[in-house]
UniProtKB/Swiss-Prot annotation:
The lineage of its organism: Bacteria, Pseudomonadati, Pseudomonadota, Gammaproteobacteria, Alteromonadales. GO terms for molecular function: asparagine-tRNA ligase activity; ATP binding; nucleic acid binding. It comes from Shewanella amazonensis (strain ATCC BAA-1098 / SB2B). InterPro entries: Aa-tRNA-synt_II, aa-tRNA-synth_II, aa-tRNA-synth_II/BPL/LPL, Asn-tRNA-ligase, Asp/Asn-tRNA-synth_IIb, NA-bd_OB-fold, NA-bd_OB_tRNA. NCBIfam families: asnS (TIGR00457), PRK03932.1 (NF003037). This is Asparagine--tRNA ligase.
Length: 466
């Protein structure tokens, strides 16, 4: 007798006639007049539940089997047989059903069989993985995570764990969560009346990181090709479907690379990940296509078969100004493109993923390489049909004098970035990288529109439960 995951059963790892045990939770119970119960049991290893055919001859049939409700946990043993029904290939002719956990009150169980709105499920985030939609999201999220690591490993990258606690603001935006052990009820003060951070844990101000990029650059300038994959934090007071206070970022960094190199890397990585989902998680993708967004499978298949278009920011602005469409946000050179502009370019003009390059320097970060025109930087965004921006990146400024001028221009302290400047003083090299918001990627793949529903426990303004 083997302990089997339901996914392995449906993959054909066990021949008909094999005695197996599956462990999981009851999704539904249906009783027939012939004295047989049909239990749909799932274990999360795949989308489908397996049907157990349970005869009334079992010793605990009346006392336990007939009392099973959605959410009860069971171990079901039996002989695997080909299913006569059209719903699935196999079912289990049960010879034993062991109840390992009851639902206290089926009438108040939040995950009972009836359908719930996805908004309601956020209020019961500790139980929502038991639903079809969140379970499917979790498996696709895992598939994408594994694909990212495989892609970079196969391409010679080294995974670097960058710090979560930092003293530097990568984006220069100041929207950071402070980390402190000071007594908030009795803050130490300097003679000038300001908070005395010399007495804090690190002896200075410290924050949760907004990006691993700057730290990642230090390793790229020694190991050539690295990537980071971890949590990042933004204290933006944005209550939208596109923003989280805590989210995950994928950030590769490549020495001796320019903007075109990382645009190609971004295209290869996205196509690799989407192919992995289409090959490994088609059961979940069919659910998303049926219940969430009918275009998700076609969209991914179209994406992986398309060549990325490329356009300069200046030309993109001209396209938008001359397209005859009225946008909510008027288009002029120097603005940061809004989602409506990005989606028009990807969905209506190019009808393909598009890389927009060479943005005005005044709307981009200090570390992006200044172009020869003195007005733009070697920055890029990858825009995807259906969502807009999915990746942002740049060639980094490797010239110390230009970097210093940019820091000064943006009123940032050179002293705060002394270690970052050292990279330009000791064997500087051209290098480039990008950032991919992982939840935005999961949202794009699944069609689930709000990124609070594609991370296990969302953190957002006024929301830090569980």
């Amino acid at each position: 007798m083997s302990i089997a995951s339901i996914a392995s059963v449906f993959k054909g790892d066990f021949a008909p006639g094999t005695e197996i045990t599956v462990r999981g939770w009851v999704r539904t119970r249906r009783d027939s007049k012939a004295g047989i119960s049909f239990l749909a049991v799932y274990d999360g290893s795949c989308f489908d539940a397996i049907q157990g055919v349970v005869p009334n001859a079992l010793s605990n049939y009346n006392d336990e089997v007939l009392k099973l409700t959605a959410g009860c946990s069971v171990e079901m043993t039996g002989n695997l047989v080909e299913s006569p029904g059209s719903g699935q290939a196999f079912e289990l002719q049960a010879t034993a059903v062991k109840v390992t956990g009851w639902v206290d009150d089926p009438d108040t169980y939040p995950m009972a069989a009836k359908r719930h709105s996805i908004e309601h499920l956020r209020d019961v985030a500790h139980l929502r993985p038991r639903t079809n939609i969140i379970g499917a999201v979790a498996r696709v999220r895992n598939c994408l995570s594994q694909a990212i690591h495989r892609f970079y490993h196969e391409n010679g990258f080294i995974w670097v764990s960058t710090p979560i606690i930092t003293a530097s603001d990568c984006e220069g935006a100041g929207e950071m969560f402070r980390v402190s052990t000071l007594d908030m009820e009795n803050l130490p003060r300097t003679d000038a009346g300001k908070v005395d951070y010399d007495q804090d844990f690190f002896g200075k101000e410290a924050f949760l990181t907004v990006s691993g990029q700057l730290n990642g650059e230090t390793y790229a300038c020694a190991l050539s090709k690295i990537y980071t994959f971890g949590p990042t934090f933004r204290a933006e007071n944005s209550n939208t479907s596109r923003h989280l206070a805590e989210f995950w970022m994928v950030e590769p960094e490549v020495a001796f690379a320019d903007l075109n190199d990382i645009a190609g890397l971004a295209e290869s990585m996205l196509k690799y990940c989407f192919n992995a989902v289409l090959q490994e998680r088609m059961d979940d993708m069919k659910f998303f296509a049926e219940r969430v967004d009918g275009s998700v499978i076609d969209r991914l298949q179209s994406f992986v078969s398309s060549d990325f278009a490329q356009v300069d920011y200046t030309d993109a602005v001209e396209i938008l100004q001359n397209c005859g469409k009225t946008f909510e946000y008027p288009v002029e050179w120097g603005i940061d493109l809004q989602s409506e502009h990005e989606r028009y370019l990807a969905e209506e003009h190019f009808k393909a993923p598009v890389v927009v390059k060479n943005y005005p320097k005044d709307i981009k970060a200090f570390y992006m390489r200044l172009n020869e025109d003195g007005k733009t930087v070697a920055a890029m965004d990858v825009l995807a049909p259906g969502i807009g921006e999915i990746i942002g990146g740049s060639q980094r400024e490797e010239r110390l004098d230009v970097l210093d001028a940019r820091l000064e221009e943006m009123n940032l302290s050179k002293e705060d970035y002394w270690w970052y400047r050292d990279l330009r003083r000791y064997g500087t090299v051209p290098h480039a990288g990008f950032g991919l918001g992982f939840e935005r990627l999961v949202s794009y793949v699944t069609g689930v529109g709000n990124i609070r529903d594609v991370i296990p426990f969302p953190r957002a303004p006024r929301s830090a439960n569980f």
